[in-house]
Amino acid sequence: MSDRKMWSNLSGQKLNKEQTLWSFGRCKTLILEMFCGAMILTALAAAAGWPVSQPTDIEMDGIDLLVPTDRRAIEEQIERDDPFCLVMPFPCGPWNSLTYWNASRHPEFKIRNEALQKKHVPMLKWLCSIAKKRIARGRLVLMENGQTSRAWNLKCFEELEGLLDGLQSDASFEYGIGDQCLLGQHDRESGEPMRGRTKWGTNGEILKQNINPMWEQ
């Protein structure tokens, strides 16, 4: 998704930084990005003066969330920092439509991908367990993956639907579908918009509002 566009919308609320975070149970940071890539959200938050958690990505810090010890390290960081918003755009490789198309044509590829999925499932279950804890604590969670990702069919993701926010009784975790082009996604060479059909999950009403008008239940 376009991190820059989303953060621009969020930061437009003109919130008092020193008061807002602390009013939500004394969060130490605004955001922790997992699978952060270029860590654009973290950079924008820091540039705006917000305290941020150290983002994590295997290409940046070597933290591999497929490894139990690395997952424990990040879980300890989450407990220590208590970030207000946890962003989790988990890997789509083993679950996307193109992967399944290739698997339907090449039996050996299908075998390899099924093994990779089995390797990823414990990590995805862990992400969902973290999300449950954060939601119950009244913190924001934002998950993202392709609309057709088969990962969404896993029971752990289905169990998140409808979870009530721990601080706001009228808020709950919901999934929505929309196009990333409305958040600024485009082809790097041609500059033309790219649809990027995507599914998000969040308990944050402000996130849902800023993803609108494309939020589809």
Residue ranges of predicted features:
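Conserved active-site and SAM-binding loop architecture
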Residues: 1-217
